[in-house]
Amino acid sequence: MGDPKRHRKKYTTPTHPWDKARLEKEMQLVIKYGLRNKRELWRFQNILRKYRRVARDLLAEIGLPGKEGEIAKAKAQTVIKKLNKMGILPENATLDDILNLSVEDFLERRLQTMVYRQGLARTIKQARQFITHGHIAVDGRRVTSPSFIVTKELESKISFYRNSPLAKTEVV
């Protein structure tokens, strides 16, 4: 089976644990997107933080003369293309658009949110239950992770799993 090298947290906790404004905002997001706990939210905040850091660094490097500037432009196009493929940025986006992203842009691309928005479940909590119980498939493959990031090309391929009893009945 093998030994895992190192387990690292995929999130960072807030620096001030009892900031009232942050706690209220986080609670609203947890309720709106049906998250199980705030660690799920912090994970997506960390992903956003990484993309914003990359965008800031690339904006600084693009201004450099010579080959460094050209390499930075190519890296910028790669990052923008990746976020576009995920469905977070539009086709003609720039690095400034990455800096304007919010954590809600990433939370909207979760499978749980997509199942609810497409009407396969009545509530966001029911969408999570359908996914964890194995009733939802993406491109014909069963996905049991509510935090699965749905790309633009897979967005139209979300459906009930073919062997699921829910596929044979009308849920909504």
UniProtKB/Swiss-Prot annotation:
GO terms for biological process: ribosomal small subunit biogenesis; translation. Residues 109-165 form the S4 RNA-binding domain. Pfam families: Ribosomal_S4 (PF00163), S4 (PF01479). SUPFAM superfamilies: Alpha-L RNA-binding motif (SSF55174). Coiled coil: none annotated. PROSITE patterns: RIBOSOMAL_S4, S4. Signal peptide: none annotated. One of its GO terms (cellular component) is small ribosomal subunit. Keywords: Ribonucleoprotein, Ribosomal protein, RNA-binding, rRNA-binding. Disulfide bonds: none annotated. SMART domains: Ribosomal_S4, S4. One of its GO terms (molecular function) is rRNA binding. The keyword Translocase does not apply. Belongs to the universal ribosomal protein uS4 family. One of the primary rRNA binding proteins, it binds directly to 16S rRNA where it nucleates assembly of the body of the 30S subunit. Part of the 30S ribosomal subunit. Contacts protein S5. The interaction surface between S4 and S5 is involved in control of translational fidelity. This is Small ribosomal subunit protein uS4. It comes from Archaeoglobus fulgidus (strain ATCC 49558 / DSM 4304 / JCM 9628 / NBRC 100126 / VC-16). The gene is rps4.
